[in-house]
UniProtKB/Swiss-Prot annotation:
Residues that span the membrane, as ranges: none
Pfam families: Carb_anhydrase
Broad class of where this protein is predominantly found: periplasm
Required cofactor(s): Zn(2+)
Family matches, as SMART domains: Carb_anhydrase
Residues that, per the record, bind substrate: 260-261
Name of this protein: Carbonic anhydrase 2
Natural source organism: Chlamydomonas reinhardtii (Chlamydomonas smithii)
GO molecular function, one term: carbonate dehydratase activity
Function: Reversible hydration of carbon dioxide.
SUPFAM superfamilies from the UniProt entry: Carbonic anhydrase
InterPro entries attached to this UniProt entry: Alpha_CA_prokaryot-like (IPR041891), CA_dom (IPR001148), CA_dom_sf (IPR036398), Carbonic_anhydrase_a-class (IPR023561), Carbonic_anhydrase_a-class_CS (IPR018338)
Localization per record: Periplasm
Gene: CAH2
Length: 380
């Protein structure tokens, strides 16, 4: 009965939305993005992420004990005995420039973030310490428990994409930053547990600066699509200096965490750089417009809605979780028919024109540390 009531409330809300509605990032009806599993967005910053992936597996966003992001403690807390990563066990990064040939590097608006991907064999990598003596139970996060004199080997972590969040997802001693970049790496060698792929993420924070634009961000920010589910090929000869986006001071905090978006899978090794890079006010505003809120109008004719007696302006993804309405017990069949009709009428994203009208955001709230090991690496 409660579910039926929720459907009726949603129906009333949707019906009350006349020719123009405001949609948060990830819910725009003109989106060309395709998704598997249950739909999600950042409207509640992850507090409502309960659902399943495309294979029917439940997300662990609300049940996991090692979730990301976190509030990184003060330096003096991490400088205590046993809370440092020894120099010989610290992660090393090597990122040559990304170079576009006109179609090999793409800036993507996927409805959740602005993401950069490439289609060629990029030579960049990070190397992560692991125990020299291993067994099938060893994991990518074992470096957190290694002692300074432990015999070690290294695995190679290959970057597969990077993307942004605003505001920052990680906090440094409670401080929030305007932007955070995540470089996602995949590890497939040496560790038995990683044959299917293990992941490590490097987080880079950005702080506002009164100076000019950060030229390292410009090749990306100058090519950000604003329509969800679309991408831009960087022009031929365009270079992204990924290595220079890493701070010159490579101090970092590392811990075991998760993806910061559904399904929120755990077992990732996180590195959060403690020295922020800079971003101008103008660049921050441009990013927030790229993930901004949209006012959308239907371009369909009134006749298409004549049978309903009023105009509809809906988003099919808003109704994604009601795909099986025939299973909903109801005192009346009207909610079923109403929502089925809405879904049928809103399958065409080109039936809408959308304009950005407000800054947006795409961050997840900080999660409880739950007693996890968090270590500081002082880069020397």
């Amino acid at each position: 009965m409660a579910r039926t009531g929720a459907l009726l409330l949603a129906a009333l809300a949707l019906a009350g939305c006349a020719q123009a509605c405001i949609y948060k990032f990830g819910t725009s009806p003109d989106s060309k993005a395709t998704h598997t599993g249950d739909h999600w967005d950042h409207s509640l910053n992850g507090e409502n992420w309960e659902g399943k992936d495309g294979a029917g597996n439940p997300w662990v966003c609300k049940t996991g004990r090692k979730q990301s992001p976190i509030n990184v403690p003060q330096y003096h807390v991490l400088d205590g005995k046993g809370s440092k990563i020894a120099t010989g066990l610290q992660t090393q990064w090597s990122y040559p420039d990304l170079m576009s040939n006109g179609s090999s590097v793409q800036v993507i608006n996927n409805g959740h973030t602005i993401q950069v991907q490439w289609t060629y064999d990029y030579a960049g990598h990070a190397t992560i310490a692991i125990p020299a003596m291993r067994n099938q139970s060893n994991r990518i996060v074992d470096v957190l428990e290694m002692r300074p004199n432990d015999a070690s080997d290294r695995v190679t972590a290959v970057p597969t994409q990077f993307h942004f969040h605003s505001t920052s997802e990680h906090l440094l001693a409670g401080k929030i930053f305007p932007l955070e970049l995540h470089i996602v790496h995949k590890v497939t060698d040496k560790l038995e547990a990683c044959k299917g792929g293990c992941f490590s993420v490097t987080g880079i924070l950005f702080q506002l600066d009164n100076g000019p634009d950060n030229e390292l961000l410009e090749p990306i920010f100058a090519n950000m699509p604003t329509r969800e589910g679309t991408f831009t090929n960087l022009p031929a000869g365009t270079t992204i200096k990924l290595g220079e986006l890493l701070p010159s001071d490579r101090d970092y905090v590392t811990y075991e965490g998760s993806l910061t978006t559904p399904p929120c899978s755990e077992g990732l090794l996180w590195h959060v750089m403690t020295q922020p890079q800079r971003i101008s006010f103008g660049q921050w505003n441009r990013y927030r417009l790229a993930v901004g809120e949209k006012e959308c109008n239907s371009t369909e004719t009134d006749a298409a809605h004549a049978d309903a007696g009023h105009h509809h302006h809906h988003h099919r993804r808003l109704l994604h979780n009601h795909a099986h309405l025939e299973e909903v017990p109801a005192a009346t069949s009207e909610p079923k028919h109403y929502f089925r009709r809405v879904m049928e009428e809103t399958e065409n994203p080109d039936a809408y024109t959308c304009t950005t009208v407000a800054f947006g955001q795409n961050f997840r709230n900080a999660q409880y540390a739950n007693g996890r090991t968090i270590k500081l690496a002082r880069y020397e």
